[in-house]
Amino acid sequence: MTVTPALLVILDGFGYREDSHDNAIALANTPNIDRFWTQYPHTLINASETFVGLPRGQMGNSEVGHLNIGAGRVVFQDFERINQAIASREFFSNPVLIEAVNKAKAGHKAVHILGLLSDGGVHSHQDHIHATIEMAVNAGVEKVYVHAFLDGRDTPPISAKPYLEKLEQACASIGGGKIASICGRFYAMDRDKRWPRVEAAYNLITDGQGEFASASALQGLEAAYARDEKDEFVKATAIAAAGEQPVTMEDGDVVIFVNFRSDRARQLTHALLDPDFEGFNRRRQPKLAGFYTLTLYDKAETRAKPIFAPVEIRNTFGEYVAQHGLKQLRIAETEKYPHVTFFFNGGEEQVFAGEDRILVPSPKVATYDLQPEMSAYEVTDRLEAAILSRKYDAIICNYANCDMVGHSGDLSASIKAVETIDTCIARIVKAMESIGGQMIITADHGNVEQMRDYENNQPHTQHTTNQVPLFFIGKPATLAAPGTGSLCDLAPSLLAMMGLKQPPEMTGKSLVAFQAA
């Protein structure tokens, strides 16, 4: 079967905002992207809120974005499913959750609740932590401990205080539960196998051993701020009142990990469960009575039981292309590799027939403002070679820079990230045009176009709800009007570019209307 080669380039975190103030895209020198606005058909599409299966007002994120893109339909997210379950009180009759708390109660053991404490809604939500505490306490569990990972990435960099205050108020209102430890997500939620970071969180959670100790979570936070540590980077701090010993994780205890997004929860889960773990030397591995996760983190990790089972997504773009016997490529650097593979394939680890993957290692730096080009040039080299090989019918590529550097809150570095992308993307457009291929350049959500939080007068490090631009390079065509399309329309658009009919499971619509020859 012969098709026109199609390429989707996802500029992660590249949103659209007309105001140029604190807008890294507007402030960057981007001769190529500037040219795209005048030379190629373009539009704006939606990448947040209900358009991607999230609640109103909720910013999009990379996991949600790639899931919707690959599915070709709006995928209602775990975040919203869990919110609805709590609102309807079905959460408190969930049989897996009942099993978890009953195991702890039967053995007079503790429930340890692990999770990112914020209202960011990207990896977790504080309401889910509060509901889990309520469930455990009302079931009669006497020892309910919260190990709170502080955000500052999907929320303002210095914003943890009200979340800790609200958690303490919730515990008081419920009549049980206490904060056992705090640390920044930089340590507890690493996803790049930087094991010394995870080790710090592991030792804190299992042995109550941190770099610091404090009589209360709020005092521990203030001490971290005095050390010039923003929320994301708060060092491991054990919380124990005067005369008390820090909380430790004992044999027979139960763990409930309440992050609903899997990618940054897997490594810590692996460290706590895997008897053959080799990331670092564990002082000990508690023999837990049960380990429960709010959603499925890893099908291969059968020792962890999901509270909310995954919803199967059939006939994703990758699966459908494979059914037609076509060749496809997924390429990204480490930070976004799971997104163009696992999430793009509907949350499936399976590699489809004819699907190749290229992983380019991300640079080993503490934060990406230190190296804003990341591995974009290496990704471009590999992508350009793949295009010119004429081997692939469909290619999905992600450039991580605008999102990962944008999360640092450093405007100067973010401008450099945008300029790097501008240089790289020009090479890719040239390569695709040279083989007669067609391509879409767009984003999965916004970030780098808003680098200042004016309300809190501090750097803006989280995603935005802004629309994202879309450029089409190919045969003469017109695009859907700005604001009428969304991420779920990208897979149908790619199939139309390839000359394939979309499957009935895809309810999105092609954004590209080709002009008659």
UniProtKB/Swiss-Prot annotation:
One of its GO terms (cellular component) is cytosol. Mn(2+) 2 binds at D12, S62, D444, H445. Substrate binds at H123, R153, D154, R185, R191, R261, S262, D263, R264, K336. One of its GO terms (biological process) is glycolytic process. The keyword Manganese applies. InterPro entries: Alkaline_phosphatase_core_sf (IPR017850), BPG-indep_PGM_N (IPR011258), Metalloenzyme (IPR006124), PGAM_B_sf (IPR036646), Pgm_bpd_ind (IPR005995). The active site is at S62. It is an enzyme of class 5 (isomerase). It comes from the Bacteria. Mn(2+) 1 binds at D403, H407, H463. GO terms for molecular function: manganese ion binding; phosphoglycerate mutase activity. Gene3D superfamilies: Alkaline Phosphatase, subunit A (3.40.720.10), BPG-independent phosphoglycerate mutase, domain B (3.40.1450.10). It catalyses: (2R)-2-phosphoglycerate = (2R)-3-phosphoglycerate. Pathway: Carbohydrate degradation; glycolysis; pyruvate from D-glyceraldehyde 3-phosphate: step 3/5. Its EC number is 5.4.2.12. Disulfide bonds: none annotated. Binds 2 manganese ions per subunit. Keywords: Glycolysis, Isomerase, Manganese, Metal-binding. Its cofactor is Mn(2+). It holds the Pfam family Metalloenzyme. Catalyzes the interconversion of 2-phosphoglycerate and 3-phosphoglycerate. Belongs to the BPG-independent phosphoglycerate mutase family. Monomer. This is 2,3-bisphosphoglycerate-independent phosphoglycerate mutase. It comes from Methylobacillus flagellatus (strain ATCC 51484 / DSM 6875 / VKM B-1610 / KT). The lineage of its organism: Bacteria, Pseudomonadati, Pseudomonadota, Betaproteobacteria, Nitrosomonadales.
